[in-house]
Amino acid sequence: MNFKYIVAVSILIASAYARSEENDIQSLSQRDVLEEESLREIRGIGASILSAGKSALKGLAKGLAEHFANGKRTAEDHEVMKRLEAAIQSLSQRDVLEEESLREIRGIGASILSAGKSALKGLAKGLAEHFANGKRTAEEHEVMKRLEAVMRDLDSLDYPEEASEMETRSFNQEEIANLYTKKEKRILGPILGLVSNALGGLLG
């Protein structure tokens, strides 16, 4: 009987965590949409300015190179050309740095998601071990089936790019974001239902 209360408390904690995750996902999804729109506008403006600046510098460098090709360069002319070439190279490297920053941000997000999945898998594994050591009622068997389904869904999130590569290849970024939000809600839905049913059975 005491163990039932321990399991019930564990399930209550999991339920609260799942509800919190669902609320956080909804809030973050809305915030992400707004932030993504703002970032797209900022990147678009910045990219236009940067592209115009690079084009102007390249045009200037090309013009000077053609001019110097028809005559001898002074030491000062040579220094000017070196600085122009360095400026163009620096602007090209900035594009690479922006891509590296995006990879770092994605890595941090993946780590947070992995930690949440590990916590839920640990709870599911503990309940599975408990039920494996004794006879299961029909209700407990149903609980375990749902737990196993949830764990399979969590495992499928470990390789989202492989699982949905063909499905999302032609989607734009906003459609991809909506797809992953729906998938997370589809996984959290069974968790909430599972917790409610298990709690009702244990305390009933």
Curated annotation (Swiss-Prot):
Predominant location: secreted
Tissue expression per record: Expressed by the skin glands.
A single BP term in Gene Ontology: defense response to bacterium
Superkingdom assignment: Eukaryota
Sites of Asparagine amide modification: N70, N133
Annotated family: Belongs to the bombinin family.
Pfam family, one: Bombinin
Protein's name in the database: Bombinin-like peptides 1
Signal sequence, renumbered to the chain: 1-16
InterPro entries for this protein: Bombinin
Lineage, broadest ranks: Eukaryota, Metazoa, Chordata, Craniata, Vertebrata
Subcellular locations according to the entry: Secreted
Keyword annotations from UniProtKB, A to Z: Amidation, Amphibian defense peptide, Antibiotic, Antimicrobial, Cleavage on pair of basic residues, Repeat, Secreted, Signal
Function: Has antimicrobial activity, but no hemolytic activity. Preference on killing Gram-negative non-enteric bacteria.
Keyword NAD attached: no
